[in-house]
Each structure stands twice: as C-alpha cells, then as structure tokens.
Amino acid sequence: MAGMASDGTQYDPRQFDTKMNAILGEEGEETFYTNYDEVCDSFDAMELQPDLLRGIYAYGFEKPSAIQQRGIIPFCKGLDVIQQAQSGTGKTATFCSGVLQQLDISLVQCQALVLAPTRELAQQIEKVMRALGDYLGVKAQACVGGTSVREDQRVLQSGVHVVVGTPGRVFDLLRRQSLRADAIKMFVLDEADEMLSRGFKDQIYDIFQLLPSKVQVGVFSATMPPEALEITRKFMNKPVRILVKRDELTLEGIKQFYVNVDKEEWKLETLCDLYETLAITQSVIFVNTRRKVDWLTDKMRSRDHTVSATHGDMDQNTRDIIMREFRSGSSRVLITTDLLARGIDVQQVSLVINFDLPTQPENYLHRIGRSGRFGRKGVAINFMTSEDERMMADIQRFYNVVVEELPSNVADLL
C-alpha cells in the first residue's frame, strides 16, 4: 500500500516542499510561511466589536492560538486569506470571528457563505458561528444534504446573516434563488484541500460564478497540498498566506504507536484485546470503507463489545443521533471512515486507532487530530500489516516523526 497522491501518483514529500516553496516564493526559518506580519497576542488587542468579544470569552477562549493571533485580523480587514494550521488549533473560530466582525446585523440578508465537505462539519461550524455571535444576535443556518429543502427555504425566506453548508445543497438553493447572492460579501472554504479536490472542485467553481465579483475569499485547512494552492489562484486576489511548514505538521502532545499484525484478518483479535483499554476513555476507530465500518461493528457487537458507528451511507438523522450520543459520552467507542476525520470536534477523545492506515499521508493528520485537541494529551495507535509498511514510512517521512511500537502498558498512557 504505497503512499499515493490524490491524482494517483506516488507521494514524494520532497516534491511537496519544492512545489510549496515555488508557490509561496519564499523560505524561512519561521514556523509559519506568511506574507503578513501582524500578530496579536490577545483578543482585546484585535479591535473586535464588544459583543463579539463577549461571545469569544463566553465560548471559553482566553488567549488566541497561534493561527488566531495571525489569522483573525487580515480576515477582519476584508483581505483574501489562505490559512493552514493543525487540527484542533482554532481555525473555525478564526474565520467565524472574521465573518462576525464584518456583518451588518441590521441587514438580515445572507452576507457570508461558508462551505464544508461534510454535513457534520457544516452543522458544527454553524453552532460555533451562533455561539460566538450570540450577543450580536446573528442568524445562521446550516444548509446540508439529507435534510428538508423546504425547511431551508423557509428559514432563508425569513432572513439569515450567514449560511453554512455543503456544496450540493448550497448550489441547489442558489440555482433556485431560494438563497440570494446579492448581499454575500464573504465566501469561506473550510477543509479546503478536500473542497478543491476533484470531487468538489467543479461545484465550488459553479457556486463562485454565482457570487458577487468582489466577494472576499477565505480558504482554511489543516493540510494544503500545492495542487490545492494552485487552484486557489483562480479565484483569489493577492491573498494573505499563513501556512505552517510541513515539518511543523505533526501533532504535539499526541503519542503515536504502531502494532504489527501479521495478517489483515488478525486485526480484529488485536482490537478485541485492546477493547478494555479503549473503553476507559473515548476512542475513535478509523477504517477505509463504509462496508468495513458495518463489518467491524457487527463483529465487535457479536463479541459483546459496545460500539457505535457512523458513515456517509447512513441517513442524516441517524448520524446526528449517533454523534450526539458520542459527544455526551453515553457511547464511548466510535467506528467511522474519514468522514469524521474532517474537523469534527469531540473534545473528550483521547485515543484514535487506525484499524486501516489512511490512503494518503495528509489524512493521517486529520484523523489523529481527533485526540489531544487544543493541546490536550492523546494517543494514536496504528495497526500495521506488511502491506502497510510503505505507507507508514511515507507518513513518518511526511511529518518528520518516528512512530514507535506500542508498549505493553498502553492503559498507563491514557
């Protein structure tokens, strides 16, 4: 299982760096590649609206993270921005703050459109937007597939300031003119590497064509391959770039281990051996296909292990219920695909198991970022057969890390 780029070619980290340097046109010793120097080490110094500040502090933020110190102000100034930082470092609050600061609350029309690749992530962003904008009186709506179009139309008719959605539903609403684009002045892509991949790229272009010509564009992600950066040139105007160097793209505080499994079919036994440890804390188990989610869930339950599962073939209502139970702690072990790896914030997760290694090095970061969010400690365990050795080597080279063999005292690590 070799490391493959999204276009199917062999993954080469050195080529990644060469391309990245060519695109950014600069190299330096700083953690961040950036062409914008202003850094604010407190929210108070950012000259935000008092009611937005109240919302930020009420949400539990005290001091801005590194990406927030650099990223909020240029967005608030109306500049196009490309921002990349690790999972769990506050990118969502960065662009939500930038959007909320610029809204004219007295004008109840859609002024900001935020797109995300999955329904769950879009709904989560909407919750953050509402929470931070609570004292401003912001009206936000999540428009995603798998929910009632009529309900979206009803809410949009009554007036909202911000729409957060998935590309398919948003394009449909724009086409029907249920969502009017006239007043939209901000356009944000979250998890932009995924949004600019082949699956979504055409839809993003179609949506962009329907927006006012002077719309501000913000592009955010935990990973930003050079291919995605090149695409952004087509619809961005001299963007402020804040990108973390690849060597910094490991997740501090997350201990990473592998378990050698001689045969694929023995992974199940290994997982069952670890189950008691899993249930001590909240754990997420990643596999590579929806079918395998169902298979592994059935196998675990047949052995009287309590697990829950979610993937893209389930209807939205079922997925919502499962995620609510997991967030509340009433379910402790969740089996899923990369669907969940994209930015879903479950604060209590401290253990991630890659039952299957991801098919691309970048997705490793998205997955293990479920544990140790906002600087907490976490553990990632990778099941590895002989076929996975190439990918594990690619991952270690890509993030400049050493993944060690799992010690016997795994419970002590949690």
Swiss-Prot record:
Residues that, per the record, bind ATP: A85, Q86, S87, G88, T89, G90, K91, T92
Protein source organism: Arabidopsis thaliana
Secreted as UniProt keyword: no
Enzyme Commission numbers on file: 3.6.4.13
Subunit structure: eIF4F is a multi-subunit complex, the composition of which varies with external and internal environmental conditions. It is composed of at least EIF4A, EIF4E and EIF4G.
Cellular localisation: Cytoplasm
Pfam families reported for this sequence: DEAD (PF00270), Helicase_C (PF00271)
Job description of the protein: ATP-dependent RNA helicase which is a subunit of the eIF4F complex involved in cap recognition and is required for mRNA binding to ribosome. In the current model of translation initiation, eIF4A unwinds RNA secondary structures in the 5'-UTR of mRNAs which is necessary to allow efficient binding of the small ribosomal subunit, and subsequent scanning for the initiator codon.
Free-text note on domains in this protein's UniProt record: The Q motif is unique to and characteristic of the DEAD box family of RNA helicases and controls ATP binding and hydrolysis.
Segments forming domain Helicase C-terminal: 253-414
UniProt superkingdom: Eukaryota
Reaction catalysed by this enzyme: ATP + H2O = ADP + phosphate + H(+)
Transmembrane region(s): none
Designated name of the protein: Eukaryotic initiation factor 4A-3
Similarity annotation: Belongs to the DEAD box helicase family. eIF4A subfamily.
Annotated InterPro entries: DEAD/DEAH_box_helicase_dom, Helicase_ATP-bd, Helicase_C-like, P-loop_NTPase, RNA-helicase_DEAD-box_CS, RNA_helicase_DEAD_Q_motif
Short sequence motif named Q motif, residue ranges: 41-69
Location of Phosphothreonine modifications: T147
Modified residues (N-acetylalanine): A2
Keywords: Acetylation, ATP-binding, Cytoplasm, Helicase, Hydrolase, Initiation factor, Nucleotide-binding, Phosphoprotein, Protein biosynthesis, RNA-binding
